[in-house]
Amino acid sequence: MKSLFKVTLLATTMAVALHAPITFAAEAAKPATTADSKAAFKNDDQKSAYALGASLGRYMENSLKEQEKLGIKLDKDQLIAGVQDAFADKSKLSDQEIEQTLQAFEARVKSSAQAKMEKDAADNEAKGKEYREKFAKEKGVKTSSTGLVYQVVEAGKGEAPKDSDTVVVNYKGTLIDGKEFDNSYTRGEPLSFRLDGVIPGWTEGLKNIKKGGKIKLVIPPELAYGKAGVPGIPPNSTLVFDVELLDVKPAPKADAKPEADAKAADSAKK
């Protein structure tokens, strides 16, 4: 359940940079048959060159589509012309002009992306608040002082977990529109983690049930990922989790032996 843990911007950026070409290639149309491939390429170098170009082209195509979402529409023909001219060493722009143009473009993309993120965050915050207020009116639902909204489906038995305990859970996580972003049931494997090692909404929420218990958590963004969001979870998203607490493993008690050894050492000095 990596969605519940912190995701750094650097890690996210690296993941996109390293895996984008492979992902785009996977989204491509059905590949040519083996016979067609053999006819099209004389050797592996030709085939590799073509594969590299195809992967680059799909990456660029995807980039153009993403920029269109920001209101930026680049001329695809000019993009292709720029690539061809660069290979022919006949660029219409000097190196300095290219650098200045790309710097200005980068600033434009960042500005547009920031504006879109702020708009999306505001929209998500308003919709999330409305959803939480509606859910809070349902039977058996409680709202804590932090804003966490929850419904205990089954209380469970034993002691409630503490921050330092390790819990084992099954769960399903969705956005308020029902879009699923995480599910241990479909993976066929429950998740084990220290209770204070996840988002605050989970740390607080699971203390309301015991082993064998089930709970529905509706978590406001300030107890989840806030304005930043993470991949798959937009900024200021209210998150909905159905959680089953399978087991609670208390934190191991501190070993008393080191303390005894320390006392013995002090006695020896005296």
Curated annotation (Swiss-Prot):
Localization of this protein: Periplasm
Source organism, top-level taxon: Bacteria
Function: PPIases accelerate the folding of proteins. It catalyzes the cis-trans isomerization of proline imidic peptide bonds in oligopeptides.
Key word Iron-sulfur present: no
Chief place where the protein resides: periplasm
Classification via InterPro entries: PPIase_dom_sf, PPIase_FKBP_dom, PPIase_FKBP_N, PPIase_FKBP_N_sf
GO molecular function, one term: peptidyl-prolyl cis-trans isomerase activity
GO biological process entries: protein folding
EC number: 5.2.1.8
Keywords: Isomerase, Periplasm, Rotamase, Signal
One cellular component term from this protein's GO annotations in UniProt: periplasmic space
Domain PPIase FKBP-type: residue ranges: 164-249
Family of the protein in this entry: Belongs to the FKBP-type PPIase family.
Endpoints of the signal sequence: 1-25
Protein name: FKBP-type peptidyl-prolyl cis-trans isomerase FkpA
The reaction(s) this protein catalyses: [protein]-peptidylproline (omega=180) = [protein]-peptidylproline (omega=0)
Ion transport listed as a keyword: no
UniProt organism field: Escherichia coli O6:H1 (strain CFT073 / ATCC 700928 / UPEC)
